[in-house]
Amino acid sequence: MPKAIATVVPLAGHAQLRAPAALTGTGLDADVTGLYDGASGSVQYIVADPITRRCAVIDPVLNYDQRSGSTQTTSADQLLKHIKAHGLTLEWILDTHPHADHFSAAGYLRDMTGAPTAIGERVTDVQKLWKTLYNLPDTVPIDGSQWDRLFADGERFTVGQMQAFALLSPGHTLCSITYVIGNAAFVHDTLFMPDSGTARADFPGGNARQLWQSIQRILQLPATTRLFTGHDYRPNGREARWESTIASQRAHNPHLRDCDEPEFVKLRTDRDRNLPMPNLMLSALQVNLAGGRLPAPEDDGRSYLKIPLNAFPQVVG
């Protein structure tokens, strides 16, 4: 169970961030189940209190086939099946950030269960940014009202009897949040597995220096904290993995072990410069910035996605 954050690292461009000085709770390990989505390399999580059997879902996936334009709930239904099979009660549906590589199933799960949805409060900054890029009408809200709760940095909540808090972790996006629940931290697109480095920071609102500073905050969590990443791309064809430790990240992640802040910023910026845009980014963000809701149906009863043409430079090669 996390007890303290020793130091708070200020992030560039923001006032100093703070997190709870201490957490108290059951002292038991969080019961974490990861379900891997091979199509996007994403991991969706169920984290449960082993005593009360109450749980949260983190980063649920709504399946989308780009060729046919069809959505399916296969991955999200796996979450519901697991929750039912293990006698769990869903208490939270949590997004760590608006994803660029898959659709969020938060809206679907809320409809199916009634559990509240949540994300970091700075999602409103990302909504404003992308409203301009999509040229959306003023009727589209950019106040975060698509979620039931917007977490501030350091804000506490509970999952069953387990104490939890939200840790603002920008860099990949403006509003990325790490959820620390019991002794588990869900670090999304900051740290990947130690053999895979770190997440990109070149999306609109992304910043490599902020990503470095966010990672340093995560690494200052108690040494017993288990780290759960948001993606795994199976380098060299190995089996998918998603759990690591602070010690293994410090010792084996080359983006941390071999870098100080200026070196990391250069490495990350150089790598990002030649990365292709995620296949689903322009489709996914207009859904994910609406809390995992498809656009409102038009007069024929069908929803349509809007793609801004020539809004981003093409990466050649």
Residue ranges and their predicted role:
Residues 31-37, 46, 153-181, 220:
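Core dinuclear metal-dependent hydrolase active-site scaffold
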Residues 200-206:
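Adenylate-forming
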